[in-house]
């Protein structure tokens, strides 16, 4: 069902070109704006001198217009009637020509146009599309096609821009599209060839066996390997390790893949994971082998990550179960403990009687409590009383039976490595790898460095022997902590590898060092940075202290053990009658719309569906693809599945078409690009610009129950009850658009938000440039404050108890008046000086995308013994957190702004909840990719709703002004596009639009349509 060339212009292929690209290539699509007229059609004195050589006004105007056209369009026009009137008048005025109708004479002789084109090419050094320019463009396109999987439409735009930049006359669209197709095909064939040559003959035979059934299942081995773990248990871990081992045994992991483009490998592997075994078997031998190699290489890493995720989750379950068992034991033993404590208290009271002689105390105590009874009480207390640092390790040791089911697989299969801080854990791992298969009950020669004080009594018995059970559980507890800090890591794993190895290093760091310092805006001398911070902090302390007496919202409370500030809650803003009236008028004007039509209408405005391209055949286009894409997005976002949207009599909505579209077009990269289109379009709307400039955003999580078995979910009784769930962490700009070019991050359970704040900010791909991020308390930590400052961002969380926070000072002797009592923390700038270059190297690595922010932050946050780098980042974070706190208590408008932005995020979540109405709003995808794709679709559809509302609210405002209404700018700034009562998300789903709406026109506002009796 590939598109055929248009009958209107058969020489222009539209296999991959959008309608907009077809209509705009070498043509005017409307009147150029003032900036474009000034840039491309302005004639300087040299131009006028050249033009003056032509005889007659018609020739002078004609050649002048051709000069402007070749600058603006990249080519000459044969029909001057296609030049907009504004361009003709603008050019004629510069030449002093009053009557532009003389232009009709210019088109009478074709030779004149040809001669003028030749003169312009010669005078302005324009060139035909020929050698060496064909070679240079081909080389550029080939390089881009080789390293990335860019859509051919993007390559077409790139090629057009490159040709115009180098003053090459645009060739026919057919020539350019054919060149792009040939180049992309050549790059693809090269990738297939290189991948197919990696395996040996024996390995190729083994890879072909992936397509055949396994011994114990009708499924092919490939299909079996696609299925990751869905439960958290010892057997599930063993199966996950066997899955990784099967992929690892192909022996492809050791090959040098540094010369192959990572993005294209990833896309090819994803395609292998989505398509059927039948489709792979039908491929050419070279492509089939390339797909299988890419699958094994990618899934080997994924399988190892999955196995380690199961291990981490399983250890967490063991610890949680041990805690539950311990707490139950504690409750059952409380009566005995209370009884024994009272008896001991009575016995000890005899020791305090002054009248009893020392030599008689023992006899008097035993007269009250017999010696044997007292010994029994003491024994009982020792058994059931727990030290203050108890972590239910006794109950963990009781879980040994669960551990021994999976530990041999762990020790014998996974190869751990370590940083210096993890050497002791690695030594213990190596020891257990050698000794665990023995039947020894005591490991007296085991490394003891991992045995902490709280574990000692459980690991070392009364006879001073190191017990097998105690040591094993102690090791697993230490291993989990070391893995989470990445002191111990697994080479070959993406999520559990060594983040330090991904930082800028060696020659790479030295080559980029000065650029990184400049881009981050920090001086190379740490003393300069510290001096600047010290000046800011000192002046801010003094300003806030001077105004504190006038600040009625803040009081200094000295009644407690430590002085603290109390901050009055913000009073709700009154909603004036004018705002209520304006909101009501706009609400009444918004026309009702089905969500299906809304998506198609937003596509007519933005063309977001053009960002969806086939996973392996990017040039493939089918008729009415936007309809199919909108249907699939609707199915995912509304959580209703494809079934309600299938129409057997509509080619774009058949079961086969929708399944094919979902499998080949819906994925993170396409959703991200489409989402960026919506966000960028929203930023151009005048109403959105009134709400904000895109410099501010908030981050928050939206919780979803996951009732299916999956390892990518976690427990939290507050949000999920007795179930498990996930958190969709997403960002909302001050223009109400949701972003992170990334559509959101899916987090198992409710992990700390602070781990993911920076990741979303750094990876977002929209045109917005947020520099200030607002979060709830959960997203705040000294480390995050420090990283934000290093990267040049302002972190503005809403702290639950800001007045009780520690305020830090840099000058120990400075007098801050009434704030002296709360400025208790003393920062240590020496730590910053010692680690300054390392701090900037880390920040630069994050900025350049060398390391994933969540991985790095997680490893830094988990450390019980922070490294010098972590301490330095925390130190600079404390200073910046204090600057934030001083601003927070001093400026009510600042507090109000934070609250307003966070409320926008919560209101947007309410719209998303309304959209995701199917299956009780529960996410039933088992694997991370499926969860991310579905919630990405939800974010995209939510953005479409926000954009549609903004467009029609703008139209409603224009309508009200035209009717003579006086509108208050302050009221307009408080309007919100987060409404959905007029949008139908249920019932019969229709994907048809009125012709005018399809062409980008707005549907009538409700009031106007009722007046004209338009449905």
UniProtKB/Swiss-Prot annotation:
InterPro entries, A to Z: DUF4158, Tn3-like_transpos, Tn3_Tnp_DDE_dom
Superkingdom, natural source: Bacteria
Transmembrane segments: none
Keyword hit for DNA-binding: yes
Matches recorded under Pfam families: DDE_Tnp_Tn3, DUF4158
Biological-process GO terms, alphabetical: DNA transposition
Keyword Transmembrane among UniProt keywords: no
Keywords tagged on the record: DNA recombination, DNA-binding, Transposable element, Transposition
GO molecular function annotations of the record: DNA binding; transposase activity
Task performed by this protein: Required for transposition of transposon Tn3.
Family the UniProt entry places it in: Belongs to the transposase 7 family.
Name the UniProt record assigns to this protein: Transposase for transposon Tn3
Organism per entry: Escherichia coli
